[in-house]
């Protein structure tokens, strides 16, 4: 029972922290906070698509696709408890970020983005949730690589 509580605590803790951080930075952005530097600007953009504004032609229907994908991932993770136990923090981060962006779609009609990297090349404008999704995917990959190596070492 204690182990079950532990992974659920990690999952929801990561979920809430990422969701709250992303929404807080977005609220500062919407309140007018702007900043410029040589490398990174804090600005405002409303992305009606997904990464790099892809699928923006779906307009308001994109939020329902986003909702369905998050719902399927939630159901799958709670059905596949082993996967959730192994990657509870990473999936908590991923889903907290996804739900935060989904909330934006329902409230603002798109996702609030604010970070613009422009040193050496102009990158797409992104937000905290986007960064957290990338970090969570990297965590899952790293955990899987080390898990496989550990398994291979035991077989030798």
Curated annotation (Swiss-Prot):
Q: Give the membrane topology.
A: Multi-pass membrane protein
Keyword flag Membrane: yes
Query: Cellular location of this protein?
Result: Cell inner membrane
Q: Which molecular function terms from Gene Ontology are attached?
A: aspartic-type endopeptidase activity
Could you identify this protein by its name?
A: Lipoprotein signal peptidase
**What gene is this protein translated from?**
lspA
Against PANTHER family, the record matches this protein to:
LIPOPROTEIN SIGNAL PEPTIDASE
Question: What is the recorded function of this protein according to its Swiss-Prot or TrEMBL entry?
Answer: This protein specifically catalyzes the removal of signal peptides from prolipoproteins.
Q: Which residues cross the membrane?
A: 5-25, 64-84, 89-109, 122-142
């Amino acid at each position: 029972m204690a182990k079950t509580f532990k992974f659920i605590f990690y999952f929801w803790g990561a979920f809430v922290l990422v969701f709250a951080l992303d929404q807080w930075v977005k609220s500062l952005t919407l309140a007018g906070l702007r900043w410029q530097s040589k490398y990174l600007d804090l600005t405002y953009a409303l992305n009606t698509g997904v990464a790099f504004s892809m699928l923006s032609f779906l307009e308001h229907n994109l939020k329902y696709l986003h909702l369905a994908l998050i719902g399927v991932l939630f159901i799958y993770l709670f059905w596949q408890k082993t996967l959730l136990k192994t990657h509870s923090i990473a999936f908590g981060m991923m889903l907290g970020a996804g739900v935060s962006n989904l909330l934006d779609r329902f409230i603002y009609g798109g996702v609030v983005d604010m970070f613009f990297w422009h040193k050496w090349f102009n990158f797409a404008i992104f937000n905290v949730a986007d960064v957290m999704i990338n970090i969570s995917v990297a965590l899952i990959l790293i955990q899987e690589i080390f898990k496989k190596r550990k398994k291979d070492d035991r077989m030798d």
